[in-house]
């Protein structure tokens, strides 16, 4: 079982129940899923770029990503409906907790000039979005083997009803918010 999952059930859930005075244990907010998305804009000209992004994302998450395709044609971008334009992975369960653990304890401290993540990126419904500028912060990615530095969006979907609950949950899980 994932280390962070144990910590959640033994320490974090009781602390959240105490703080927000939940009557029922099912009201306690928890991490539902983590979605990692990599937009590959250059895939319009270079179809090999998608393969590199898929490879990087599968190394980082340990799960095969799904290729996202364009929903509409946009002539200005030379984009047609159905063209591959990115990749994404949805993590749940133990894999999700292991990824979050690695992200917070290994990857984020490797970011240059890191002073914590913004606490303003909540969407009003208890979900948090984190943007990462380069995939090199993950130890699974070797510097010599990448073709291009790519960023990614990481979305933490929680069962929290408010941003305050979600902020408290992620803070207790170890998210390094700016002071």
UniProtKB/Swiss-Prot annotation:
Keywords: Ribonucleoprotein, Ribosomal protein, RNA-binding, rRNA-binding, tRNA-binding. GO terms for cellular component: ribonucleoprotein complex; ribosome. Pfam families: Ribosomal_L5 (PF00281), Ribosomal_L5_C (PF00673). PROSITE patterns: RIBOSOMAL_L5 (PS00358). The keyword RNA-binding applies. It comes from the Bacteria. GO terms for biological process: translation. The keyword rRNA-binding applies. GO terms for molecular function: rRNA binding; structural constituent of ribosome; tRNA binding. Part of the 50S ribosomal subunit; part of the 5S rRNA/L5/L18/L25 subcomplex. Contacts the 5S rRNA and the P site tRNA. Forms a bridge to the 30S subunit in the 70S ribosome. This is one of the proteins that bind and probably mediate the attachment of the 5S RNA into the large ribosomal subunit, where it forms part of the central protuberance. In the 70S ribosome it contacts protein S13 of the 30S subunit (bridge B1b), connecting the 2 subunits; this bridge is implicated in subunit movement. Contacts the P site tRNA; the 5S rRNA and some of its associated proteins might help stabilize positioning of ribosome-bound tRNAs. PANTHER family: 60S RIBOSOMAL PROTEIN L11-RELATED (PTHR11994). Belongs to the universal ribosomal protein uL5 family. This is Large ribosomal subunit protein uL5. The lineage of its organism: Bacteria, Bacillati, Bacillota, Clostridia, Eubacteriales.
